[in-house]
Amino acid sequence: QWDFFDLPEQWTINYKNLTFNLKPFSFKHTGLFPEQATNWDWFSEKIKNANRPVKVLNLFAYTGGATLAALEAGAMVTHVDASKGMVTWAKENAVSSNLADRPHYDAIIMDPPSYGRGPKGETWKIEENIFPFIELCTNILSDDPLFFLINSYTTGLQPAVLSYMINTAIVKKFGGHVTAEEIGLNVTSNGLVLPCGASGRWEN
């Protein structure tokens, strides 16, 4: 059963020290994927415990949840998204979280769409492009990388597939180890977990 209610045009929520500006969209997004908090906590600890400056590249970065978490942990972050509106929104979130003045790759985070088009009509199909893209990304990792994180909402990219790709592209080059698992949100009313895709993590 669905409960419907009126939403404000825009509102803010907080997660730890981060503040996010949310607004409803016709395509069912609000500007935040809260299930990603488990990944934010994971890489924030790695950044804080690195005991060195950490440069992070966040690809398909949307409104900047992972960007803000990495900034707040002390990293320097380059935020990349094809949508100019999403980049503007990410900047607004950075201002709200008092992180706008931090300097803009020991780590890469990516949240690729299943399908997309670039500003010049380029086509992105995750089944065809994701593995070559991961391989290209290994060329811009530092000599001593800290972590690599891939999120997937695509049915065909299950944890085992993510693990295989990361092992093939990254472990053979840098060593380290890989974990991959489904992620979800706890449903408080019945104790079940709402599936929200999968994540693959590499760490040194």
What are these regions (language model features)?
Residues 1-32, 41:
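Non-catalytic substrate-recognition/targeting regions of SAM-dependent transferases
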Residues 83-109:
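S-adenosyl-L-methionine
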Residues 145-204:
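C-terminal catalytic and target-recognition region of SAM-dependent MTase-like enzymes
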Residues 76-81:
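Conserved SAM-binding motif I beta-strand of class I
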Residues 34-52:
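Conserved alpha-helix/loop element of class I SAM-dependent methyltransferases that forms part
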Residues 102-171:
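S-adenosylmethionine
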Residues 51-62:
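Conserved class I S-adenosyl-L-methionine
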Residues 63-75:
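Conserved SAM-binding loop of SAM-dependent methyltransferases across substrates and taxa
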